[in-house]
Design a protein with these regions (language model features):
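Hydrophobic/small residue at the entry helix of a nucleotide-binding pocket
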Residues: 33-34
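Glycine-rich phosphate-binding loop and adjoining beta1-alpha1-beta2 segment
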Residues: 46, 51-89
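Conserved N-terminal Rossmann-fold NAD(P)-binding element of oxidoreductases
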Residues: 27-29, 52
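Conserved SAM/SAH-binding loop
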Residues: 98-106
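Short, well-ordered coil/turn residues at beta-beta hairpins
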Residues: 120-121, 144
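Glycine-rich phosphate/adenylate-binding loop
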Residues: 112-113, 126, 136, 141, ...
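N-terminal charged helix/coil linker that caps or initiates catalytic domains
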Residues: 1-26
Length: 254
């Protein structure tokens, strides 16, 4: 019977589509990268999602985040993403967690339930905790490195964390993961040299903040605000999703 995934099934086959429909993917960070990861996964037939993010859609997200429109500003990102998932696949199972994942609340998550874990957050502490928990549970995990201050979408590639270059976030992650004995980690990163922003947006944000009421991570609290464009984090997210689908339809390494 023809359905919304029929064209995908022509490439992956019925058995893999069944496997994807039963896969439970946890995505930490529903922003510029994470939103596109989820978008591609649900359109590829993944049937179960755990969306983790405590932030609300901000006006400044509209330039790059698939969930951000004038209508969704002020709404929780996980709620907007859930609605979008169910519009695409009403049979999907979606759990939303309105929290910022850190060691302090790690006990609230059972990683052993997940088929795959996606780290699409910006904070190093959170990234490390997500990765370590996934590794401990033997769950496949993939991590997004920096997408801010970049202009070349073709510079993204999949690599082991210890083979990354140029990315400042990847440099920090290499050091911290090596300290913790992590031997390997699949990541998506850009080898493009970061572009220096033409202006310091954090200055204007202090006097003209447009963050929605109740936002947890206001721009006024950030030391530096990176520049961004629509065609960079989206590509990173789609590359991540492609790798996840490949792994879920074969046998991914942990």
């Amino acid at each position: 019977m023809i359905n919304q995934f029929s064209r995908t099934q022509l490439l992956l086959g019925a058995d893999n589509m069944e496997r994807l429909s039963k896969a439970k993917v946890a995505v930490f960070g529903i922003g510029g990268v994470g939103g596109y990861v989820v978008e591609a996964l649900v359109r590829s037939g993944v049937g179960l999602f755990v969306l983790v993010d405590d932030d609300k859609v901000c006006l400044t997200n509209i330039n790059r985040q698939i969930i951000a429109t004038r209508k969704t500003v002020g709404q929780y990102k996980v709620d907007v993403m859930k609605e979008r998932i169910l519009d695409i696949n009403p049979d999907a199972d979606v759990e939303v967690r309105k929290c910022f994942y850190l060691p302090e609340n790690a006990h609230e998550f059972d990683f052993s339930e997940y088929s795959y874990v996606v780290d699409a957050v910006d904070t190093v502490t959170a990234k490390i905790e997500i990765i370590m928990r996934a590794k401990e549970c033997g769950v496949p995990v993939i991590s997004s490195m920096g997408a801010g201050n970049k202009l070349d979408p073709a510079a993204f590639q999949i690599a082991d964390i210890y083979k990354t270059t140029m990315c400042p976030l990847a440099k920090v992650m290499r050091r911290e993961l090596k300290k913790r004995g992590v031997k390997k980690l699949k990541v998506v990163y850009s080898n493009e040299k970061p572009t220096r922003p033409l202006d310091d947006m954090s200055i204007s944000c202090r006097t003209n903040c447009v963050c929605p009421p109740g936002a947890k991570h206001k721009c006024t609290e950030r030391r530096d605000i990176p520049g961004s464009v629509a065609f960079v984090p989206s590509v990173a997210g789609l590359i991540l999703a492609g790798e996840i689908i490949k792994d879920l339809t074969t046998s991914p390494e942990t």
